[in-house]
């Protein structure tokens, strides 16, 4: 039978240190939805992105209100072509139900926008993403 048995250690000034509770160890290894998303997006990792999205996921275009399904967005996000550059990216709010972000985006075309993004979450996965954008001077 293998396994790790926690033991006590003597710390500074000879104090006995107890091992951290297992829950603390587990929590330290969990990443937020945003951290997982950023890692997968930067790597163009289709499987990791797909795992973060519900099968019913839709992206709503702010210009037209048109809904784009999961597979079409995955194809767009992992394509080998030029990508948008995200500047001053920040998470405004994140919990188990919603992620709200803001960023300035430089598009390959030279256009620039300030973008507010919202991702609705269901069971830890993105179910709907929508953005609102304001054109910025170049």
Predicted features by range, described:
Residues 8-51, 55, 138:
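Short, low-complexity N-terminal intrinsically disordered segments enriched in polar/charged residues
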Residues 30, 36-37, 50, 67, ...:
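Generic alpha-helical hydrophobic packing signal
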């Amino acid at each position: 039978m293998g396994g790790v048995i926690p033991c006590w250690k003597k710390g500074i000034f000879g104090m006995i240190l107890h091992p951290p509770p297992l829950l603390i160890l587990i929590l330290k290894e969990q990443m937020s939805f945003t951290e997982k998303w950023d890692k997968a997006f930067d790597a163009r990792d289709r499987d990791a992105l797909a795992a973060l999205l519900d099968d019913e996921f839709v992206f709503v275009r702010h210009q037209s209100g048109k809904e784009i399904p999961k597979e079409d967005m995955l194809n767009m996000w992992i394509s080998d072509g030029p990508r948008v550059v995200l500047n001053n990216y920040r998470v405004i709010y994140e919990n188990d139900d919603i992620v709200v972000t803001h960023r300035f985006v430089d598009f390959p075309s030279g256009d620039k926008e300030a973008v507010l993004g919202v991702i609705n979450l269901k069971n830890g996965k993105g179910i709907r993403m929508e953005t609102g954008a304001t054109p910025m001077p170049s």
